[in-house]
Every structure is written in structure tokens, then in C-alpha cells.
């Protein structure tokens, strides 16, 4: 499945991609730009479905020039580019929704472009609410048609992490939900700088927030034979959050982890972004 550099959404002008590409094991086809835009000199994208799956839940957005909503002033509209990776899990529906819509939720906020961090927070919240409402309504309708009261098998449990880079004029805004990472290469590749922080259940800030909101953090244990045949050993799995059983503490979607009617808690696994600004 080709998920690399999807069409430029909502009327945004696309740029020609070099037909030459590199094939990597277990990766989709890697593609790169032959033309930049403003301070963006080049860009590239690639996703990897992994070794154990025959499907890919990751999605990519690359929009070099976000289209100005009609109700926004042309005079105040800046040059803005949007790059995002959506690391889907439990299905691709949530990642698909974010790829197609998240940038529009951000730029349509009243606070955009005067206050980009506020617009990002508000846009993320609206996108989350909209997606959960779609999933809930679809499940309710399907259950009603079948006369079913148990939601098992009727609810779209997909979710997604998100790492977003929004470039407005000369400022870079990095917004993170989950454990997808943004890094920056500097000094000719000799230095690598982290631009985001992973949202993991066992990370101190996240652990405090989870437990204060009545969530639980646990770690699975698996007993396996030792390689040398001398007995067994205990293998610890990743830290996870209940409700949700996720190994990340922030995500979009994941309705069963969030809506009380499905046993969730909206304050435990959240879609609140952590935002960093770079000049």
C-alpha cells in the first residue's frame, strides 16, 4: 500500500516527485522532493509496516502551502507548511482521519495564525472530539440495526499517535501526542537533537497525571524458557495504561479507553499535545 506523500489536501498545490526511488526491506517506496518551497529546501517520506504484519497503519501528511480558509483574511495569512506522521494502532481509521483533517482543524481556529500554540491545542481537541463522535454514532447505529446491546465487535477501536511540525514564516512549532519522535540533524549530521518527548506511562510527568485521574499503570510478565535450557526467566513487557491497555499515555481515538459508556476515562489517555517552539 503506497502511503508516501499523499495528495495535497483541500486544494493545496502538489509538487512533482522524483520518479526514482529506493526500495528498502519491509518499507514502502521511499520518495523525495525535487522542488522546495520557501525555507523548505527538500523533504522525503517513508513508512515501514514492520516484520510481523502484512498491513500498514501509519500515515503521512506533507502540505507545503496550507490553503487559506475563505473566512480568513488574505492580508494576515502567513506562509505555512505542515508535516505530520500519524502512527496508527488498532486499525487505520483514526490515522486516516487525522491525515485528511487535522491541519484544517488547526488553521480554522480563531486563534490561527495570531496564536499558533493555542490553535494547535484547540484544533487537536476538536479533531479528537469529532472523531470520537463519528465512531460512537456509527457503533450506536450498527447496534440498533442488529438489536444488540453489547458493543463488542461494533466499535472502531483504532487510535493514533501524532507528531506534527508546523512551520509559519521562520518559526517551527512541534506538537506531539504519543511516542512518535521529531529529531533534528545539525552540524552536518554530527549532532542529533530531540525536538519532542515520548509520552509513556512510566515517564514521571505522565505517571503522576494518570494516577491522579484514577488510571492504573501496569507491566505484563511472561515466563519463557532460557536459551541455555537451564530453566525459565521472566520477561517484562512495556508499561501499559488502564483503561485502554495502551503502551502510550497520549493518543487520538482509542474510544474504549476514553468514553465512560465503554469503560473508559477521558482524563487518563488524552490527546493534549506537548508543544515546543523553535526560531
PLM regions and their residue ranges:
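PP2C/PPM-type serine/threonine phosphatase catalytic domain
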Residues: 1-279
